[in-house]
């Protein structure tokens, strides 16, 4: 049985820091927020037509990962509640959690009991567990061998807590406390607004594996899907997408610096919203996850601390603004202000995101992952890695376009509107006097008076000894280090190794005359 929370470290030629993915993404959204089973079915049809973007094993029976994010269907779960003999209340007055437990019954019972205790300790009412009806025969043998026990839980919203983000924030604290106390259990989702169904499937297996997705009573206005192609990553149930807020195609190539920076901030971090709960949810980033899971951790943290999801995405994955002379001064001030607080999470990557109310898509500023979308006359937005994944009559197409680097496509299902990128960003850029704040508080390094003292240097013999000890070669110094020192530019040199094999060298390699002077 797979341990869903275990960190897999370097082994042989494998190192998790070099993992990359190339995946298929898609979404169907009813812009007016009208829920239907048709949206669920259409989203599943999209992912089934992204088979060429989904990885599979040599036998062709186990996939790298497929999943779907939906709104919680009150009609469906009210029926489930009757079967469980519990009362859920009205829509969004309860949370639904999806759990991947160990198959071992004793370990599963321990984890369930622990979660119930944590829930009650955090002031919430635990209602019931539900074993999710699945068909193990729908998946390959390798997926069955590491398949978790899949359960759902139901939690009642306290009367004093508001619907939406306030209740989800309480559920977030419960989940984080449980995750840090539990070993071997993974929580794909725990929310009052969204739910995630996923696993190590082939694209056609998702619909067949989860009976919930076949039920005509399961209705949603939002369906986001993902098919995973792990180019050099070990597939697992945990690493299938969607995550709790996002799914993505590509990779985050700045992930090490991003996660290190988030960790460093934890020493001084505070929140007027989380208050004393802040210590319960740290660390922000679960470093055993994939790059997209870590990005999801960061976005989730910002949202739970009061930031709108579109705003969190805007400052995490900014458009190319620094050398763009065509953007307004207000927008430039906005990006510069947040750039002092958060480093960009750069891809190449295409991101789909949702909190159950809004659905958005964005390309990072590299713009190297394709995403195309339709807006239809009957009020739907259809987006995918490529066109043709869902049949749509030409006369029903109102807008046909593609995502552009740094630009955001956003649908607000509560207001029932498609939000223009320029209008959205102009609104956020105008909410605070960012320019005044920068003028009053920003300090540039070039303005600091730094003593221009000569840096001590090693004598020739000592420098050569140190260079040998730390593996410096002549090419390192000539082609990389010296140009960096002279120009301040990032290293771009690259060349093959033309040194003879060690067994053919007359003297040890380190003693050969290739060292800088």
Give names to the regions the model predicted:
Residues 1-517:
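Conserved short alpha-helical segments that host acidic/polar catalytic motifs at enzyme active sites
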């Amino acid at each position: 049985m797979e341990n869903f929370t275990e960190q897999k470290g370097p082994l042989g030629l494998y190192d998790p820091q070099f993992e990359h993915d190339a995946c298929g993404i898609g979404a169907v959204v009813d812009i007016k927020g009208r829920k239907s089973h048709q949206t669920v079915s259409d989203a599943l049809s999209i992912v089934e037509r992204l088979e060429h973007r989904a990885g599979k094993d040599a036998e062709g029976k186990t996939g790298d990962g497929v999943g779907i994010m939906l709104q919680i269907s009150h009609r469906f779960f009210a029926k489930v509640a009757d079967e469980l003999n519990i009362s859920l209340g009205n829509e969004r007055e309860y949370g639904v959690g999806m759990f991947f437990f160990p198959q071992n019954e004793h370990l599963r019972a321990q984890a369930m009991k622990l979660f119930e205790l944590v829930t009650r300790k955090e002031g919430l009412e635990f209602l019931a567990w539900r074993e999710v009806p699945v068909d193990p025969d729908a998946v390959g043998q390798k997926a069955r061998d590491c398949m978790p026990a899949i359960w759902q839980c139901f939690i009642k919203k306290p009367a004093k807590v508001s619907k939406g983000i306030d209740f989800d924030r309480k559920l977030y604290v419960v989940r984080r406390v449980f995750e840090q106390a539990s070993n071997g259990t993974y929580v794909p989702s725990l929310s009052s607004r969204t739910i995630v169904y996923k696993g190590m499937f082939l694209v056609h297996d998702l619909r067949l594996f989860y009976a919930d997705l076949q039920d005509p009573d399961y209705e949603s206005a939002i369906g986001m899907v993902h098919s995973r192609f792990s180019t050099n990553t070990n597939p697992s149930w945990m690493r299938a997408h969607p995550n709790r807020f996002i799914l993505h195609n590509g990779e985050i190539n700045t992930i090490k610096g991003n996660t290190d920076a988030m960790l460093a901030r934890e020493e001084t971090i505070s929140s007027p919203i989380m208050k004393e709960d802040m210590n319960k949810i740290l660390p922000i980033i679960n470093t055993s996850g994939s790059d997209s899971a870590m990005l999801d951790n960061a976005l989730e943290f910002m949202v739970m601390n009061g930031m709108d999801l579109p705003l969190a995405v805007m400052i995490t994955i900014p458009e190319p603004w620094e050398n763009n002379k065509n953007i307004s001064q207000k927008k430039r001030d906005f990006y510069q202000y947040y750039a002092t607080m958060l480093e960009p999470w750069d891809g190449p990557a295409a991101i789909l995101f949702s909190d159950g109310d809004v659905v958005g898509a964005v390309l990072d500023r590299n713009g190297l992952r394709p995403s195309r979308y339709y807006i239809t006359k009957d009020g739907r937005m259809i987006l995918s890695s490529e066109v043709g994944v869902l049949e749509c009559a030409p006369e029903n197409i109102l807008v046909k376009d593609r995502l552009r680097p740094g630009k955001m496509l956003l649908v607000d299902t509560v207001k029932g509107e498609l939000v223009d990128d320029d209008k959205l960003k102009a609104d956020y850029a105008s909410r605070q006097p960012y320019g005044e704040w920068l003028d009053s508080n920003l300090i540039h390094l070039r303005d600091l008076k730094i003593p221009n003292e000569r840096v001590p240097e090693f004598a020739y013999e000592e420098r050569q000894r140190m260079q040998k000890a730390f593996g410096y070669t002549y090419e390192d110094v000539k082609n990389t280090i010296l140009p960096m020192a002279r120009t301040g530019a990032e290293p771009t040199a690259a060349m093959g190794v033309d040194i003879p094999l060690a067994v053919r060298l007359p003297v040890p390699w380190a003693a050969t005359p290739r060292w800088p002077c």
